[in-house]
Amino acid sequence: MSDENLLTSLDTYLASGIHIGTQQKTEDMKRFIYRVRSDGLYVLDVRKTDERLRLAAKFLSNYEPQDIMAVTRRVYSVGPLKKFGETTGINTVAGRFVPGTLTNPAAKKFAEPEVMFLSDPRVDKQALKEAIEIGIPIVSMCDTEHLTAHLDFIIPTNNKGRKSVSLMYFLIAREYLKNRGIIGEEVPFSYDDFLEKAMGAKVKMPQQNQRGRPQRRFQRR
């Protein structure tokens, strides 16, 4: 595969790990999978990711930034998403999505977006649920193990890694602004700007019990 017509170089894509999936796959995501590695990890087709990313940015560019809501609850996506909002003007919800944000007019941060952009349909399930309820289009990054029912547009990618999510948000921001005629070939921000935000993310470690062993905390999925 050559770099020609790709949104960034193939080396950049591969170095970010956007193609590295999980050891699970669904029928929904099967068409985006290139191969399975000897260790059982499914590998996404970079060319298809590039194509879908380009189309997603073009679709989103039909909307004013204030009419788009981009959501993530993934730790490594929070910083890059905030940078995404800063560069594009798109509304972002980084962290917990408060129930009723889209469905309860009395909610403190009630919003009426025309399109939803998710980082993960499973982790961002509350936002997904409410977007379905009010009937707006839903664009989402999806990894190999995701179910895609109710999603209107899928961007197949590793949506868990710092480098991969940073690259996704950078490229979508760049293409969104280009498509809207706001920037030209000279881009006033870089992939590194987004990656820097991801690298600053801190993950809370499990608390130690009296014997010095991590306490297990079970969460509903």
UniProtKB/Swiss-Prot annotation:
- Mention any Pfam family matching this sequence: Ribosomal_S2
Question: GO molecular function of the protein, one example?
Answer: structural constituent of ribosome
What does the record list as GO biological process?
translation
A Gene Ontology cellular-component term: small ribosomal subunit
Q: Does the keyword Acyltransferase apply?
A: no
**Which UniProt keyword terms apply here?**
Ribonucleoprotein, Ribosomal protein
- What InterPro entries does this protein's entry cite? Ribosomal_uS2, Ribosomal_uS2_arc, Ribosomal_uS2_CS, Ribosomal_uS2_euk/arc, Ribosomal_uS2_flav_dom_sf
Query: Does the record bear Ribosomal protein in its keywords?
Result: yes
Q: Where is this region: Disordered?
A: 202-221
Q: Which HAMAP family match?
A: Ribosomal_uS2_A (MF_00291_A)
The family note in this entry says: Belongs to the universal ribosomal protein uS2 family.
Q: Which NCBIfam families match?
A: uS2_euk_arch
Q: What is this protein called?
A: Small ribosomal subunit protein uS2
**Encoding gene (name):** rps2
